């Protein structure tokens, strides 16, 4: 049986992955766990998400599916933050006999849930049409993520994956400040990067894998393999860990990005990668955000933003000039692209004027007075005007990214970039 669950958390607390870790232990009474649990991030632009818009899936071999359904339902009722308006839990249960027939259908649903917008009624209709067992609470929006997570579990070979070691706090500690040794995270990063990433932000001296909300998560280490994330986790010094789980995830894969041949294709609440030319110089607006415009070959434009949380990435954005050719990726809300990565493909030439050099001694001439040109004091040679010469740009071609402290869950870090033909500038 495959179990998909979503939307049990709220902005104030709880975490669906905690429920997954708990069930992973408890459900062994009714069967055998067949593989790692899944953590599936969905479309990051959805406005009614709680926090990270993540769903989970578990896979077990069992002879008593009804007991599993009853147990999962009971635990959702106990742990879900039902008082929160945005919390609308959903659970889906796929029987083993249906794996083959549902595999392509739910793969398509997964891809749409990550890249597009799905209405609750669409999920409910599909569940009814396919005869899938499910449980929902309140408006049942969690059924969308639950179905998508089941699609991921049915199709593990169809999507790029990473892993996350999630450590959870003792329940009595929930809501209190986390007691962690900051230096141990930097040491874990030193020993395991680039096999792990987003543990810390070196440039901004921040630990980024420790949440600040009142949820049960103590920390989460992301990386390329279960072994690497667990090695990094073993180096962390902190308050006691109640339990932990290693999830297979679609985090750090760029799974959310759609290719856009032209800016006219771009819509709000979707994420894209596209190419264009800087058509309005970067400007810093109130709040410290940096905004500039990009135009495509058809003349369509879109505003692009390096928002204040992207910190040092804004310095790079400010160095762009009119005419620079760039390739961007990010999510669109309110008609503006929130930049996740930027590939500088071609830079326009920058020129400056300087005093001419003496052809005899090679030194720069001095002004001979207003309207009198330039003269070398040593040699007496003259020139009528300044000369125009190429200036060095303070930006190099290559691929850049926002810092770890600003990276979205699905954005692929440059630590994972395998294209040898692109010069990368990882943000550390």
UniProtKB/Swiss-Prot annotation:
It comes from Methanosarcina acetivorans (strain ATCC 35395 / DSM 2834 / JCM 12185 / C2A). GO terms for molecular function: ATP binding; ligase activity, forming carbon-nitrogen bonds. It is found in: Cytoplasm. Coiled coil: none annotated. Gene3D superfamilies: 2.40.50.1010, 3.30.70.2200, 3.90.600.20. Belongs to the TiaS family. It catalyses: cytidine(34) in tRNA(Ile2) + agmatine + ATP + H2O = 2-agmatinylcytidine(34) in tRNA(Ile2) + AMP + 2 phosphate + 2 H(+). GO terms for cellular component: cytoplasm. ATP-dependent agmatine transferase that catalyzes the formation of 2-agmatinylcytidine (agm2C) at the wobble position (C34) of tRNA(Ile2), converting the codon specificity from AUG to AUA. Its main location: cytoplasm. This is tRNA(Ile2) 2-agmatinylcytidine synthetase TiaS.
């Amino acid at each position: 049986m495959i179990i998909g669950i979503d939307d049990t958390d709220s902005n104030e607390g709880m975490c669906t992955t905690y429920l997954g870790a708990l069930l992973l232990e408890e459900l062994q009474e009714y069967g055998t766990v067949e593989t790692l649990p899944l953590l599936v991030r969905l479309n990051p632009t959805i406005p009614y998400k709680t926090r990270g818009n993540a769903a989970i899936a578990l896979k077990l071999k069992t002879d008593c599916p009804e007991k599993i359904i009853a147990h999962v339902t009971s635990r959702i009722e106990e742990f879900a933050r039902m008082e929160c308006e945005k919390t609308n839990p959903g659970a889906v249960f796929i029987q083993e006999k249906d794996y083959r027939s549902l595999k392509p259908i739910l793969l398509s649903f997964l891809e749409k849930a990550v890249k597009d917008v799905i209405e609750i009624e669409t999920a409910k209709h599909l569940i009814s049409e396919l005869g899938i067992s499910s449980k929902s609470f309140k408006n049942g929006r969690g059924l969308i993520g639950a179905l998508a997570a089941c699609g991921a579990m049915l199709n593990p070979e169809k999507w790029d994956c990473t892993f996350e070691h999630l450590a959870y706090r003792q329940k009595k500690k929930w809501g209190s400040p986390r007691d962690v040794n900051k230096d141990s995270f930097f040491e874990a990063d030193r020993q395991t990067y680039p096999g792990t990433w987003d543990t810390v932000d070196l440039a901004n001296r921040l630990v980024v894998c420790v949440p600040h909300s009142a949820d049960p998560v103590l920390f989460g280490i992301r990386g390329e393999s279960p072994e690497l994330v667990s090695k990094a986790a073993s180096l962390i010094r902190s308050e006691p860990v109640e339990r932990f789980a290693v999830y297979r995830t679609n985090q750090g894969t760029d799974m959310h990005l759609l290719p856009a041949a032209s800016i006219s294709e771009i819509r709000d609440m979707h994420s894209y990668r596209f190419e264009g030319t800087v058509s309005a110089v970067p400007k810093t607006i109130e709040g410290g955000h940096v905004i500039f415009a990009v135009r495509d070959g058809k003349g369509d434009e879109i505003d692009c933003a390096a928002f204040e949380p992207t910190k040092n990435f804004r310095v790079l954005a400010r160095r762009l000039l009119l005419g620079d050719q760039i390739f961007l990726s990010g999510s669109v809300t309110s008609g503006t692209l929130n930049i996740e990565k930027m590939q500088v493909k071609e830079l326009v030439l920058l020129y400056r004027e300087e005093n001419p050099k003496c052809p005899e001694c090679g030194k720069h001439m001095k002004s001979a007075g207003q309207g009198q040109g330039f003269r070398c004091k040593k040699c007496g040679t003259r020139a009528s005007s300044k000369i125009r010469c190429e200036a060095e740009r303070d930006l190099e071609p290559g691929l850049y990214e926002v810092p770890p402290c600003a990276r979205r869950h699905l954005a692929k870090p440059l630590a994972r970039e395998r294209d040898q033909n692109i010069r990368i500038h990882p943000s550390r």
